[in-house]
């Protein structure tokens, strides 16, 4: 998201956490009729506003690993001190590389922080292209582990393709992480906060679109069908809006759709939706879906 909006949300979160002493009981309203689709809501868990409000990833290696979450409270102090003050929606390869996307408020680069299967951390920096946006909202690794997709904030008709940092042998922390290709979308998308592969050529994405003019609904769950599995070159992408994400809270105001994860082992799709106002503390949710 843009730096100014992020700073306002971070300030609100910090203030609310410091002041919150009462428990607010959430009263859920029914989902809107337009929310019907191929993915059916099956449950939800509370999303902690500091440590679970930006993204999530299921991790297969090592075995029995817990799900990983990101939020302003998960950013290491050392990274924040160097200006990397926003973390987006992470992903992990099936072989155990875990990847977090980071951005600064200014500059000409974005960074991916990678934990190898053995536990060591490395940083891979990408220098922005001439027309590339600064933000670094999410990372989605192809099922073969070799290619990583990322996106840009705003209204876009493309996704960016990189070699997967750490997992792809062509990458090195000491060298620039290059963009090698582009996914050319046949329909514009807006404010995509996360994507994850559900198959070799299929992405599921959470959009924070507040306007609704692109697909006739706000905050949509999107599917992007690629013309071929990522191989580092350009591919086409066909975009479909599947349904509106749940927007339920005790508070009224602007919701924020955040990260997304598809767990191939269980077939469960999870999406974080942050509640408005004070309810960011009490009834922000990670919603669960199954395909019907």
Please state what every model-predicted region is.
Residues 1-35:
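Secretory targeting and sorting signals
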Residues 35-50, 69-75, 242:
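A short helix->beta-strand "capping" segment at the edge of beta-propeller domains
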Residues 187-238:
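Loop/turn-rich, solvent-exposed surfaces of beta-rich toroidal or solenoidal domains
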Residues 52-56, 87-89, 138, 194, ...:
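Conserved beta-strand position repeated once per blade in WD40 beta-propeller domains
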Residues 44-68, 85-89:
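Beta-strand-rich domains and repeat architectures in extracellular enzymes and scaffolds
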Residues 44-51, 78-83, 126-133, 183-188, ...:
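Surface loop/turn motifs at the tips and blade-to-blade linkers of beta-strand repeat domains
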Residues 66-70, 105-114, 155-164, 211-227, ...:
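Structural motif
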Residues 69-103, 123-127:
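Blade-loop segments of beta-propeller domains
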């Amino acid at each position: 998201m843009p730096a100014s909006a992020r700073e306002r949300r971070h300030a609100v979160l910090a203030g609310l956490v410091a002041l919150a002493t009462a428990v607010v009981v959430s009263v859920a309203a029914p989902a809107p009729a337009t929310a019907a689709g191929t993915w059916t809501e099956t449950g939800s868990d509370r999303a902690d506003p500091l440590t679970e409000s930006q993204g999530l990833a299921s991790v297969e290696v090592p075995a029995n690993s817990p799900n990983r979450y990101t939020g302003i409270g998960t950013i290491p102090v050392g990274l924040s001190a160097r200006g990397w003050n926003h973390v987006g929606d992470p992903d992990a390869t099936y072989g155990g590389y875990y990847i977090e996307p980071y951005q600064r408020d200014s500059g000409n680069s974005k960074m991916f922080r990678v934990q190898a299967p053995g536990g060591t951390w490395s940083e891979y920096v990408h220098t922005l292209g001439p027309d590339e946006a600064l933000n670094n909202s999410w990372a989605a690794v192809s099922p073969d582990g070799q290619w990583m997709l990322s996106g840009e904030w705003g209204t876009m008709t493309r996704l960016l393709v990189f070699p997967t940092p750490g997992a792809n042998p062509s990458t090195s922390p000491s060298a620039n992480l290059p963009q090698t290709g582009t996914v050319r979308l046949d329909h514009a998308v807006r404010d995509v906060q996360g994507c994850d592969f559900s198959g070799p050529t299929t992405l599921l994405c959470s959009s924070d679109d507040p306007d609704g003019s692109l697909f006739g609904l706000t905050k949509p769950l999107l599917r992007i069908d690629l013309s071929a599995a990522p191989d580092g070159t350009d591919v086409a992408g066909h975009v479909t809006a599947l349904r509106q994400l749940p927007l339920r809270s005790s508070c009224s105001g602007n919701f924020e759709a955040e990260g997304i994860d598809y767990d191939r082992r269980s077939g469960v799709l999870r999406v974080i939706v942050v509640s408005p106002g004070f309810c960011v503390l009490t009834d922000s949710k990670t919603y669960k879906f199954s395909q019907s």
